Amino acid sequence: MLDVRYIRENLELVETRLKTRGTGIDLERFRQLDSQRRELLQQTETLKALRNKVSEEISRVKDKSQAQDRIAEMREVSQRVKGLDEELKGVEEALEYFLLTVPNIPSSATPVGASEADNVEIRVWGEKPHLDFTPKPHWEIGEDLDILDFERGAKLTGARFTLYKGLGARLERALVNFMLDLHTGRHNYLEMLPPFMVNRESMTGTGQLPKFEDDLFHLGEVDYFLIPTAEVPVTNIHRGEILKGSELPLCYTAYTPCFRKEAGSYGKDTRGLIRQHQFNKVELVKFVHPGHSYAELDKLLDNAEEVLRLLKLPYRVVELCTGDIGFSAARTFDIEVWLPGQDCYREISSCSNFEDFQARRASIRFREDEKAKPEFVHTLNGSGLAVGRTVVAILENYQQQDGSVVIPEALRPYMGGAEKIG
């Protein structure tokens, strides 16, 4: 959520920067609500001061019968204050809802562009495999090896659900453990295992609500939501808290299943594991000092990249332009892994700095010391990695001409020493 004072004092800048997203801000609506709120606050404070003055005068009168006019005046003022308080509450709720629907301002370092076509390639790592045969897409490999069953997954639930079998299930589990061990060991993240359902406040804190409710799986009876990413519960761990500045940065990692309707993806990636309603992901989340947040973003991005380097999977890093970054993000880098069976790079991680946007929504603050005024932290997150898409990358990059798949060396201890599937 953007700061009201910042918008008020930088109206043209806010409007200009948000237009680079392809969205905008209804400045007239903002001015109206902000002006109403400030006017009502002033009226309320004036009347409360008058009420306090009259009350003090009444307290000095020994014979209360001589103060009936003043008592009546105080009651009248109190009724007017009550009415103004109710009106102010309505205006503040309208202003808050308005602010909750306004996206974050892109960082000045974020490249300006209209769509993913304007994203900027930052670096490329690794060599694409040189295959002496026509590479197959992962869905064919998985079915041929009998480790992915798309037909039964659809039978159990519906489209975009998959049944992992045998070494396919073990490969998925091995990747989760490998990623968590790397991030908790070498990268010093604290592992969390959060609930897979969250309340409305949590979804609002990270920016999914109120704007994207139609994209979420909602459990109406209890007003809970299935999480679309571990970012939601893990970021909200510190919702409404004031952290110690000496403890920052706080670095958490979590494995969770993720649930997404994928409402806008009809007809896209209808085969395979790329776009599922349920998938597993290992997430990285940081709560950091505002002055260090972009240095911490570089570290988080490298932590996610290291998973691919250790698995020897070729990838590239792309910086998203203003027209392609997410609602809550100020700056985002995507890691895209090479998939020879599809002859393209596909996103496997998205690493973002939200600056104080989420912290302001979720009221996550810190104090430099005990006497300091609380400030909002900066929040960061990234996939470390999407597990199903890592399975895809292994199947396609390590496929052999005889139909088998070599298991990356770094993963073999997690696969009982097995060197290949098939």
From Swiss-Prot:
Entry protein name: Serine--tRNA ligase
GO biological process, any: seryl-tRNA aminoacylation
Family stated for the protein in its record: Belongs to the class-II aminoacyl-tRNA synthetase family. Type-1 seryl-tRNA synthetase subfamily.
Native source organism of the sequence: Geotalea daltonii (strain DSM 22248 / JCM 15807 / FRC-32)
Pfam families: Seryl_tRNA_N, tRNA-synt_2b
Subunit details: Homodimer. The tRNA molecule binds across the dimer.
Keywords attached to this entry: Aminoacyl-tRNA synthetase, ATP-binding, Cytoplasm, Ligase, Nucleotide-binding, Protein biosynthesis
Keyword Aminoacyl-tRNA synthetase part of the UniProt annotation: yes
InterPro entries (UniProt xref): aa-tRNA-synt_IIb, aa-tRNA-synth_II, aa-tRNA-synth_II/BPL/LPL, Ser-tRNA-ligase_type_1, Ser-tRNA-synth_1_N, SerRS_1_N_sf, SerRS_core, tRNA-bd_arm
Pathway assigned to this chain's UniProt record: Aminoacyl-tRNA biosynthesis; selenocysteinyl-tRNA(Sec) biosynthesis; L-seryl-tRNA(Sec) from L-serine and tRNA(Sec): step 1/1
Residues engaged in binding L-serine: T229, A230, E231, E283, S383
SUPFAM superfamilies: Class II aaRS and biotin synthetases, tRNA-binding arm
Annotated gene: serS
Main location: cytoplasm
Disulphide bond pairs: none
Its biological purpose: Catalyzes the attachment of serine to tRNA(Ser). Is also able to aminoacylate tRNA(Sec) with serine, to form the misacylated tRNA L-seryl-tRNA(Sec), which will be further converted into selenocysteinyl-tRNA(Sec).
Residues reported in the UniProt entry to bind ATP: R260, K261, E262, E347, I348, S349, S350
Cellular localisation: Cytoplasm
Keyword ATP-binding listed: yes
EC number per UniProt: 6.1.1.11
UniProt free text on domains: Consists of two distinct domains, a catalytic core and a N-terminal extension that is involved in tRNA binding.
Swiss-Prot/TrEMBL catalytic activity: tRNA(Ser) + L-serine + ATP = L-seryl-tRNA(Ser) + AMP + diphosphate + H(+); tRNA(Sec) + L-serine + ATP = L-seryl-tRNA(Sec) + AMP + diphosphate + H(+)
GO molecular function: ATP binding; serine-tRNA ligase activity
Entries under HAMAP family matching the protein: Ser_tRNA_synth_type1
GO cellular component, one term: cytoplasm
